[in-house]
């Protein structure tokens, strides 16, 4: 019986150690930008690696700066929804298909939730331009990031005036 308890204790300690190591590795991967954060992130909080990757994928104009970013993909390069100081941008690059769509802030006539998500499902924000075109953004609801993202779009586009 004592031998069984020793073995069970060792196995339990190994399991706890593995879980701790996985959580630590995930945290490091998120902080370094190798794995996308599960939350909406302010531009000044993004790792420089992610900022450069997003600028490339979203085809930034010279001097353009990120205000908010969210990725629904495993990596920031695979998918991005971005608010900059000039545009609202959505891009996808899944390896076989890549596209990038955007609206200039001065062209935005409306921005609203099409669907309010929760911890497990992203919210959908529809941004409409004055010419009738629109852009759908998928934004994480965790820690009210979707509300902060939408409020920032409205403020940047002058819709709250």
Region spans (language model):
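Glycine-rich, low-complexity intrinsically disordered segments
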Residues: 13-16, 20-24, 41-44, 155-158
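N-terminal Sec-pathway targeting helices
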Residues: 1-18
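Terminal and domain-flanking low-complexity segments
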Residues: 142-161
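Phosphoinositide-binding peripheral membrane targeting modules
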Residues: 69-123
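Non-catalytic accessory segments flanking enzymatic or RNA/DNA-binding domains
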Residues: 111, 133, 155-158
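Canonical phosphoinositide-binding patch of PH/PH-like domains
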Residues: 129-147
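Anionic N-terminal interaction surfaces
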Residues: 23-81
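Short polybasic amphipathic segments
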Residues: 123-129
């Amino acid at each position: 019986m004592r031998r069984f308890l020793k073995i069970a204790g060792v196995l339990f300690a190994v399991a706890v150690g593995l879980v701790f190591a996985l959580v630590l590795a995930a945290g490091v991967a998120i902080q370094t930008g190798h794995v996308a954060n599960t939350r909406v992130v302010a531009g000044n909080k993004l790792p420089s690696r992610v900022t450069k990757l997003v600028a490339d994928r979203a085809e930034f104009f010279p001097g353009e700066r990120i205000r908010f970013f969210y990725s629904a993909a495993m990596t920031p390069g695979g998918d991005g929804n971005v608010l900059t100081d000039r545009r609202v941008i959505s891009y996808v690059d899944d390896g076989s298909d890549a596209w990038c769509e955007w609206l200039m802030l001065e062209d935005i006539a409306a921005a609203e939730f099409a669907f309010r998500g929760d911890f497990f499902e992203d919210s959908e924000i529809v941004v409409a331009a004055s010419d009738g075109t629109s852009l759908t953004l998928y934004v994480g609801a965790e820690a009210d990031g979707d509300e902060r993202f939408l409020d920032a779009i409205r403020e940047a586009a002058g819709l709250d005036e």
